[in-house]
A protein has these predicted regions:
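FAD-site-proximal beta/loop scaffold in flavoenzymes
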Residues: 334-358, 443-514, 547, 553-556
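N-terminal Rossmann-like FAD-binding beta1-loop-alpha1 element of flavoenzymes
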Residues: 226-250, 370-378
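Glycine-rich dinucleotide-binding loop and its adjacent helix/turn
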Residues: 206-220, 282-294, 325-380, 485-500
Length: 613
């Protein structure tokens, strides 16, 4: 027998590894609406299977917990059982030797804290209501509730105009979202059970590119009611689009010269060309929406007072977005050469881009705005562009695709560095950034916090500092008019109404803080429905499109179609769109990858889909 042997995985271990891969795909695709008690019991069994059997809390205790959770699921448990589960889980958490045991105990305790009422429902009524309400994942995870399986099936049938009509029922920004949406609909796609999520955003782009001119739906008879909408961003425009269809005359008051909000002034042309955004806006305005551009609402000279709007319109919707920048709060931040990312992107949108030719640029921040500023600075001729972020690259809130694209175009990511001070010359211009090296520390609020590393600060020479650490809302004029706010955000209720302010509604970034485009659109949709009710009506929005029935097909594993991009060396020299659309063959293949969850595997869709709201 050999003294030592090269270790190889056994056949059994190879099978187990494959099972782990299958399990990972299942976890990724776990849709909203699953029974949380069932999920807790299933994960507990996995933890128990991983135990080494050395310590009693893990070897015996997890088995006892399993049995008690099975009693809950089988309707055999009592409320005393629930108390015993809690005590047992705490004992395991406090006494297990390693993370296999104590993390299992923590998971059960966290479950009891987060969904105790579901445990009680099983105990008292013998069942959980979640399975009866389980939604189609892509539809449920789209903030606007777009009928994703429906429009994918229409694309598969090459009915592109109908696909656009169906999307517009819930989201009027078809083209814009096809290019820049963060596609939360894809995160829990059941196609992950087989191979990989359907490229939903890419299919939407194909429909938008090939639908031709799709006119807006006809509006209802005029109601005689008027609605003032403050802010012409995605939320305000969406609300106007639906309210106008309901027969209410809408007027948008926009302080800038162009509509679109951050879609126009915050997203560079290489991601969302202005002419493509104009397609969506023109469709909205074609319903009869009126606009008053270069008009500010406030209490200053030349501004229209909020009181006047309230007196002259039947309802008011505030959707002013979040268009001001946050400060670093460090010495030197007011120096020449320090600019906000929001202002920089706004200047680009207005056709007045800064000249960074030959400059060394540092961008502070880790979100999508920081990436937009970074990639724009490269296109504006910067010699070097570095992104400074106090956490790790993995902790950045920007889309990973955007981060990788910035790196591919030449940007450097300075992770775990926090800005400490900005150095200037005698003329008050930036010369260097002083950065404090960090290490990753304790997890608070779901993300690890940076901590002092003990290393000396470093000096990074630079000519320009772009600050992209967040956005604020200009709420003061509205607060003076009596609109309640907390930390600069308006306090709106779930239906978008403002408490004790009859006929006043608010939504979008000015309520939630800076969020995604699709969330702003969803807020406008919610506001439109509830403003319609407030005005004394109950109009319905529908598409009139019939979704084709699914065909019985053998859904064999098939790779996801990825969106191709222009060559890096070429695209970083201009602001032309980076991403290429799908070909006809790619779109057809991708559309047929959809598993049609609207018909298979989800009882909530039995008998029909949501055709109106």
């Amino acid at each position: 027998m050999s003294r030592l042997e090269v270790r190889k995985k056994s056949k059994a271990q190879l099978v187990v590894d494959n099972l782990y891969e299958d399990l990972e795909r299942r976890i990724i695709a776990s849709p909203p609406g699953l029974c949380p008690v069932d999920m807790t019991a299933s994960f507990l069994k996995l933890f128990h299977a991983q135990t080494c059997g050395k310590c009693v809390p893990c070897r015996i205790g997890l088995g006892v917990l399993e049995d008690m959770l099975e009693d809950v699921l089988d309707g055999k448990a009592t409320l005393e059982t629930l108390s015993l589960i809690e005590r047992t889980a705490k004992a395991i958490y406090d006494s297990a030797d390693c993370a296999i045991g104590y993390e299992a105990g923590r998971m059960v305790l966290k479950g009891l804290e987060g969904f105790r009422e579901d445990f009680i429902e099983h105990i008292t009524n013998g069942h959980c209501s979640c399975h009866l309400e389980q939604p189609v994942p892509c539809v449920a995870l789209c903030p606007a509730g777009v009928d994703v399986p429906g429009y994918i099936s229409l694309i598969a049938d090459e009915r592109y105009a109908d696909a656009v009509k169906l999307i517009r029922k819930d989201n009027p920004f078809v083209t814009s979202c096809a290019l820049v949406c963060e596609h939360p609909c894809e995160t829990k796609c059941r196609r992950n059970f087989v191979d990989d999520a359907v490229n939903i955003r890419g299919l939407k782009r194909y429909a938008a590119d090939h639908c031709g001119l799709v006119p807006p739906p006809e509006c209802c008879e005029p109601t005689g009611k008027t609605v003032a909408i403050i802010g012409g961003g995605p939320s305000g425009l969406s609300a106007a689009y639906y309210l106008q269809q309901m027969g209410h005359q809408c007027t948008i008051f926009e302080q800038r010269k162009e509509l679109g909000g951050m879609l126009y002034y915050g997203i560079p042309n290489y991601r969302l060309p202005k002419e493509r955004l104009a397609e969506d806006i023109q469709n909205i305005l074609a319903t009869g929406v009126e606009t008053k551009m270069n008009t500010c609402i406030g209490d200053g000279d030349g501004e229209i007072s909020f009181k006047m709007l309230k007196e002259n319109y039947d309802a008011v919707y505030i959707s002013i977005g979040a268009h001001t920048d946050k400060k670093l709060g460090i010495p030197g931040e007011d120096a020449k050469g320090v600019i906000s990312a929001i202002q920089m992107l706004r200047d680009i949108g207005d056709g007045n881009p800064p000249n960074f030719t030959g400059k060394n640029v540092i961008v502070v921040g880790g979100g999508n705005v920081a990436m937009d500023a970074t990639r724009s600075a490269i296109r504006l001729g910067a010699k070097n562009v570095s992104v400074m972020y106090r956490r790790r690259k993995a902790d950045m809130t920007a889309l990973m695709d955007e981060i990788e694209a910035a790196i591919a175009e030449g940007a450097e990511i300075l992770e775990l560095h926090a800005p400490q001070a900005i150095e200037t010359n005698k003329k008050g211009h930036v010369t260097a950034m002083v950065a404090d090296p960090k290490i990753i520390g304790l997890i608070t609020g779901g993300r690890p916090s940076p901590a002092n590393s003990g290393r000396e600060p470093i000096h990074i020479p630079c000519d320009i500092v772009i600050v992209a650490i967040g956005q604020d809302i200009v709420s003061e004029p509205f607060e003076r008019a009596g609109i309640p706010a907390k930390r600069g955000r308006f306090l709106a209720q779930k239906d978008s109404s403002i408490a004790e302010k009859d006929g006043v509604f608010a939504g979008g970034d000015c309520v939630t803080g800076p969020a995604t485009v699709i969330r702003a659109i969803a807020a406008g949709k919610v506001a439109a429905a509830n403003i319609d009710n407030y005005l004394g009506f109950n109009h319905k929005i529908e598409s009139g499109v019939v979704v084709p029935e699914p065909r019985i097909e053998n859904k064999t594993p098939c790779g996801r179609v990825t969106m191709m991009e222009r060559n890096t060396t070429e695209r970083k020299k201009d602001f032309n769109i980076v991403e290429n659309g799908m070909t006809c063959k790619e779109a057809n293949q991708e559309a047929h990858r959809c598993l049609r969850c609207d018909r298979f595997g989800y009882g909530v869709f039995k008998g029909g889909r949501v055709e109106e709201w």
